[in-house]
Swiss-Prot record:
GO terms for cellular component: cytosol. The keyword Heme does not apply. It catalyses: (2R,3S)-3-isopropylmalate + NAD(+) = 4-methyl-2-oxopentanoate + CO2 + NADH. Mg(2+) binds at residues 217, 241, 245. Belongs to the isocitrate and isopropylmalate dehydrogenases family. LeuB type 1 subfamily. The lineage of its organism: Bacteria, Bacillati, Bacillota, Bacilli, Bacillales. One of its GO terms (molecular function) is magnesium ion binding. Homodimer. It is found in: Cytoplasm. This is 3-isopropylmalate dehydrogenase. One of its GO terms (biological process) is L-leucine biosynthetic process. Pathway: Amino-acid biosynthesis; L-leucine biosynthesis; L-leucine from 3-methyl-2-oxobutanoate: step 3/4. Its main location: cytoplasm. It comes from Listeria monocytogenes serotype 4b (strain F2365).
């Protein structure tokens, strides 16, 4: 079968790690007899450089026409004073494709507990997913303005927006340990009161899945104290932005974690959670694991190629266990050497 993928390498270390991800995809295609048609397009700062737009029209069309989208990283000080910033392109892409659900898996296998800033006994075997609503809340609410005397942001959520993200969380929980933690601030916010009510309604349709409610401050605390108690966390845009970044540092490095953004219909977007790291760009020292894991996530969630995704995950695990660690993990393995070992493991793996 042929799968059509749009590649958005972006800025900073994005092109380097995208090269790694596409090499892994090529190895999978060869081993399992698949065809992946890859179209590469400028995005973010690269889009500004070639078209004065972080998401050129040709890039957006390619994304709409794809079966899935891979994104490297965007941004950098070069575009700080540009009329349009690279990050504007990502917001526009999310809106254009209707990407409403961001999925961020957080895993700390026993082999990497020493990298975590938390004690081994706290983080060992941590395995949960943060499901963040992407299209509503304070980031998109109107009216929105500020001047020297006052500023206004608007927090608005509709029933439909809340219900679909909570249903997505329950859908994911059904494939895991059947527990959903809904995070809100229902003791203060009107939107959270509606959020909690709808969460209860959705839970009533899934009697085999446990629902618990936590205020966002309590959730932030428990994520550090007892991260292994979570299975699937679902929350609104602002809370999800903060909590997912907090969760990410539990592993010890942002360089290992992928994420996915899903629409109700159409292509999904897969990307590392880290930034463009312009300070280490073009030095062959960036950790490509999060990009490689994003490829695995794409194969699993967009194409249902579970065996192929498992092969990538096993290959990256064996690579790390063999001592191939990049600088962010305390080693000195280069981007290309890490990637080459993963390719070797895929080709020679079971």
């Amino acid at each position: 079968m042929t799968y059509k993928i749009t590649s958005l390498a972006g800025d900073g270390i994005g092109p380097e790690i995208m090269t790694s991800g596409l090499q892994v995809l090529e190895a999978v295609a060869k081993k399992y007899n698949h065809t992946f048609e890859i179209e590469s397009h400028p995005f973010g700062g690269a889009g500004i450089d070639v078209a004065q737009d972080p998401i050129p029209s040709s890039t957006l069309k390619a994304c709409r026409d794809a079966d899935a989208i891979l994104l490297g990283a965007i941004g950098g000080p070069k575009w700080d004073n540009a009329p349009k910033r690279p990050e504007d392109g990502l917001l526009a892409l999310r809106k254009a494709l209707g990407l409403f659900a961001n999925i961020r898996p957080i895993q700390v296998p026993s082999s990497i507990t020493h990298l975590s800033p938390l004690k081994k006994e706290i983080v060992e075997n941590t395995d949960f997913v943060v499901v963040r609503e992407l299209t509503g809340g304070l980031y998109f609410g109107e009216p929105k303005y500020w001047d020297n005397e006052a500023a206004v942001d608007s927090l608005t959520y509709t029933r439909a927006e809340i219900e679909r993200i909570i249903e997505k969380a329950f859908e994911i929980a059904a494939t895991r340990n059947k527990k959903v933690t809904s995070v809100d601030k229902a003791n203060v916010l009107a939107s959270s009161k509606l959020w909690r009510k709808i969460a209860d309604e959705v839970a009533s349709r899934h009697p085999d899945i446990t629902l618990e409610h936590l205020y966002v401050d309590a959730a932030a605390m428990l994520m550090i104290q007892r991260p292994t108690t979570f299975d699937v966390i679902v929350t609104e845009n602002l809370f999800g932005d903060i909590l997912s970044d907090e969760a990410s540092v539990i592993t010890g490095s942002l360089g290992m974690l992928p994420s996915a953004s899903h629409a109700e219909n159409g292509p999904s977007l897969y990307e590392p959670i880290h930034g463009s790291a312009p300070d280490i760009a073009n030095q062959n020292i960036a950790n490509p694991m999060s990009m490689i894991s994003s490829v695995s996530m794409m194969l699993r969630q967009s194409f249902s190629l579970f065996e192929e995704a498992d092969a990538i995950d096993a290959a990256t695990a064996r690579t790390m266990q063999a001592g191939f660690l990049t600088a962010d993990l305390g080693g000195n393995t280069s981007t290309t050497d890490f990637t080459n070992e993963v390719l070797k493991q895929i080709e020679g793996g079971e």
